[in-house]
Amino acid sequence: MFDKHKRESLLLRDLLKKLIIIVIGSIVAAYGITLALYAGFGGATLAVLWQGIAETFHLSIGMASFVVAVGMILFALIYDKSQIHIGTVLYQIVYSTCVDVFATCHVYSTYRWFNFFIMLLGVILFAVGTGLYASASLGRGSYEAVTFALAEKNNWQVQVC
């Protein structure tokens, strides 16, 4: 009986550790994407979609990101629910909230070369945050879930060229 209690305690501690990693990774990724978005050099495809939704429907960037992610999560749930776990949902809630928080406190230079380095820092932080989140192994992000759901159900290969 003691072994069972100890095992459950270890599992709970491991889960809590992973959830903390997801939250930290989400915060770092959100800060990174916010730096990159507002540096003034344009954005990636999804960031442009978020900006368009935000302007069209008078939403914040974080809320637009959340709306797109919910749509992708719903698609992945219908198409291949094995891609979605607690980490998928937790990441998106923390990430979208933090994007809105960080968007209110960004300060940029009038020098484009300096903003370029801010954008690079943002991309690096986004990658680090995403890596942290992924290392917890508690579900894919909404965008990755759709990619892997489509790939696995259709026998497509996801690879680096």
Spans of model-derived segments:
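Core subunits and conserved enzymes of cellular information-processing
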Residues: 2-161
